[in-house]
Each structure stands twice: as C-alpha cells, then as structure tokens.
C-alpha cells in the first residue's frame, strides 16, 4: 500500500504542536478591515488551537503527523 499524501493546503495552514494539538491562524483578517473595530482586530491576532471536533479532519489531511 502506498503512503498517504498530505494535503498541500493543510500543510500551509496548520502546525502540529508537541502535545498533539494543532494550531491555526485566525480568519477574517485579510481585507475590509476599516469597518471592524480595533478591539475586534486585536482579538483576531495570533494563533488558536483547532477545536477537538475538527481533529478527525486534521488526522485525514495530515496523515504523517500522528494525530
């Protein structure tokens, strides 16, 4: 059986942490930000963990990550 390929789109967007969680960037931070308050933009900074309900999808997209 050949190896499963990693999804290139997931490779670019997610990083697996040593504890097995996956971190991702926040959405809604690309354009049309003038109507968004400074507080909203500040809360969208940085990275957050992928929710546990989506970890099954992560395991399929990143088969070599050991999730």
Swiss-Prot record:
<keyword id="KW-0689">Ribosomal protein</keyword>
<dbReference type="InterPro" id="IPR001706">
    <property type="entry name" value="Ribosomal_bL35"/>
</dbReference>
<comment type="similarity">
    <text>Belongs to the bacterial ribosomal protein bL35 family.</text>
</comment>
<dbReference type="InterPro" id="IPR021137">
    <property type="entry name" value="Ribosomal_bL35-like"/>
</dbReference>
<keyword id="KW-0687">Ribonucleoprotein</keyword>
<dbReference type="GO" id="GO:0003735">
    <property type="term" value="F:structural constituent of ribosome"/>
</dbReference>
<dbReference type="GO" id="GO:0022625">
    <property type="term" value="C:cytosolic large ribosomal subunit"/>
</dbReference>
<feature type="compositionally biased region" description="Basic residues">
    <location>
        <begin position="1"/>
        <end position="16"/>
    </location>
</feature>
<dbReference type="GO" id="GO:0006412">
    <property type="term" value="P:translation"/>
</dbReference>
<dbReference type="InterPro" id="IPR018265">
    <property type="entry name" value="Ribosomal_bL35_CS"/>
</dbReference>
<protein>
    <recommendedName>
        <fullName>Large ribosomal subunit protein bL35</fullName>
    </recommendedName>
</protein>
<dbReference type="InterPro" id="IPR037229">
    <property type="entry name" value="Ribosomal_bL35_sf"/>
</dbReference>
<feature type="region of interest" description="Disordered">
    <location>
        <begin position="1"/>
        <end position="24"/>
    </location>
</feature>
<dbReference type="Pfam" id="PF01632">
    <property type="entry name" value="Ribosomal_L35p"/>
</dbReference>
């Amino acid at each position: 059986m050949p190896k499963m390929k990693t999804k290139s789109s997931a490779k670019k967007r997610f990083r697996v942490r040593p504890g097995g969680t996956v971190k991702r960037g926040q959405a809604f931070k690309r354009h049309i930000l003038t109507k968004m308050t400074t507080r909203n933009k500040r809360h969208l900074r940085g990275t957050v963990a992928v929710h546990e309900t989506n970890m099954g999808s992560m395991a399929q997209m990143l088969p070599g990550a050991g999730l």
